[in-house]
Design a protein with these regions (language model features):
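Serine-hydrolase-like catalytic core of hydrolytic proteins
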Residues: 5-183
Length: 184
């Protein structure tokens, strides 16, 4: 999602794409390490296409995957109505952007060998909000076994269980907070 000119959001949920960068020459007998890039942008803006990893992939003999995922309210929106209408915990969470990232990691595990990558040597890395998302993946049981190393560049994280999130949602003053210390 990108912010439009007058405070409006433009975009689409049709954003679940990824890019795979490989060295120009790949040896069929050697599986390469995989780097899984999560862009920054406050989880409200940004896209995988902003980054060209082709030179990095060739220079260091890596397979690099950059992903798109739902952003803004399409990516992270908890509402009590989700709990009432959803049959599974994942949908109840409202963490759709994180679930998109996990889906992309599952795709990597199933398909990266076809691109010369080693599905047993995957490093997730991201900067800013992407770094925050790295921490979210580290703490998610749904991502267990989908990657092996992690690099967070300037990201931080906080987590809330569903009960805490619903209390935070119901607190009308929560929108007035200016510091993460105020949440604690």
């Amino acid at each position: 999602l990108d912010r439009g000119g007058k405070g409006e959001y433009t975009g689409s949920e049709d954003c679940l794409y990824l890019n795979v960068f490989t060295p120009k020459k790949i040896s069929s007998d050697k599986k390469l390490p995989v780097m899984f890039w999560i862009h920054g942008g406050g989880n409200t803006s940004g896209e995988a296409a902003s980054y060209d990893f082709s030179k990095l992939a060739s220079a260091h003999e890596l397979v690099i995957v950059s992903i798109n995922y739902r952003l803004g309210f399409l990516g992270w929106f908890y509402h009590p109505a989700f709990a009432a209408t959803s049959n599974n915990l994942e949908d109840k969470s409202g963490n759709f952007g994180t679930l998109d990232q996990i889906m992309a990691l599952k795709w990597v595990k199933q398909n990266i060998n076809d691109f010369g990558g080693d599905k047993n040597n995957v490093t997730v890395f991201g900067e800013s909000a992407g770094g925050h998302n790295v921490f979210a993946l580290l703490s998610s049981p749904l991502a267990k076994g989908l990657f092996h190393k992690a690099i967070s560049q300037s990201g931080a994280t906080n987590t809330f269980d569903l009960e805490e999130a619903s209390k935070f949602f119901d607190n009308k003053e929560s929108s007035l907070l200016t510091s993460s210390k105020e949440v604690i």
